[in-house]
Amino acid sequence: MPTLWIVLIVVAVVVIWVIAIYNTLVKLKNNRENAFADIDVQLKQRHDLVPQLIGAVKGYMEHEAGTLTAITEARNKAMGASSINEKIAAEKELSGALSGFNIQVEAYPDLKASSNFMQLQTELSDIENKLAAVRRFFNSATKELNIAVQKFPNVLFASMFGFKEEEMFDLGDTRAAHEKAPEVKF
């Protein structure tokens, strides 16, 4: 009889331990999804601003139709993405298109003098700053989840429960354009 009790206690401890691992992984996954919800709010605001921005520049940038089309297509793709990883990839593309747009705007001094355009640019800049802040929070939550998935003994059960390492929301190739200091010419 004592052997049976020992076996039952060991089995109970193992079951409780596995449940604790599962619950920890679920909590971390939910934290990541909640962090992305904050990003989603800012992305929606950016998506809503893009048509206004394009409308404001159409008259000035007649020769840049390809750029404006690329921005519109990237926006539509981003709005149509459903999973977090699809949205991340689509938003990288939109960020790249907007970055290229900002570079081309430099060639249009009349456009830069437009108060409507400048207001939209300021709004876009504010949204980008908010996005940077919530992206840091999202990446922190993603990092915590990835570490938990990689740690032993969690790694033994994570894939069995459907948990895997998740993608961070970095700027990818557009990072250099966002981080490059503006060139000042006199």
Regions of interest found by a model, annotated:
Residues 1-186:
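A helix-centric hydrophobic-segment signal that preferentially recognizes long
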